[in-house]
Regions:
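ADP-ribose/adenylate-binding Rossmann-like module
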Residues: 88-94, 99-125
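Short glycine-/small-residue-rich Rossmann-like dinucleotide-binding loops
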Residues: 77, 93-94, 141
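Glycine-rich, highly charged phosphate/nucleotide-binding loops
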Residues: 56-58, 62-83
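Residue-level detector of alpha-helix initiation sites
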Residues: 22-23, 96-97, 143
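An accessory alpha-helical subdomain
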Residues: 143-150
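Hydrophobic, well-ordered beta-alpha structural blocks that scaffold small-molecule cofactor pockets
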Residues: 1-44, 49-52
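Structural motif
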Residues: 14, 87-88
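Hydrophobic beta-strand scaffold residues
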Residues: 38, 73, 110-113
Length: 150
């Protein structure tokens, strides 16, 4: 797969994260650092995610149910929760079935998706980032060996 390296403006953009564990926490921290509005949808949440909640910045939404629970919740509640015009979806669960279903949901809704369990399903990757003042460098292995890019 050929990927194009690019930087996008995320200030005040809505980003969804499915899953509330350590991977979700790391992704949320990166997105919040870029000024995004982050909504985390999960059955359970790392305590740090819940403690950092702030309306319009980081919001955690609890769901119950099987692999389609997050997609069903989004279909039923997105508008009333103020979640529209989603910039990206990050599937950060450790359940490949849930991540696969959410990638399908994202594609149906024309939302770029990233999957923690299947790099081949990713529309984009999170690079390792080095910042020095106004200089920002992103290094990626295209999801192949993320530890190598650190």
């Amino acid at each position: 797969m050929a990927v194009f390296p690019m930087f996008i403006e995320l200030e005040n953009e809505i980003c969804l994260i499915i899953g509330g564990g350590k991977v979700a926490l790391r992704k949320a921290e990166v997105l919040l650092d870029m000024g995004a509005e982050v909504h985390v949808i999960s059955r359970e949440f790392e305590s740090e995610l819940e403690q950092c909640q702030s309306p319009g910045r980081l919001e955690c939404h609890a769901v119950d149910g099987g692999p389609l629970a997050a997609a069903v919740w989004l279909e039923q509640n997105a508008r009333k929760e103020g979640i529209g015009n989603v910039a990206m979806l990050i599937c950060a669960t450790d359940d490949e079935r849930i991540n696969d279903q959410m990638v399908l949901w994202a594609r149906k809704n024309r939302i770029p998706a990233n999957s923690a369990t299947n790099p081949a399903d990713c529309d984009f990757y999170f690079p390792s980032v080095v910042r020095r003042g106004n200089l920002m460098v992103g290094v990626s292995t295209g999801g192949g060996t993320p530890a190598l890019s650190r």
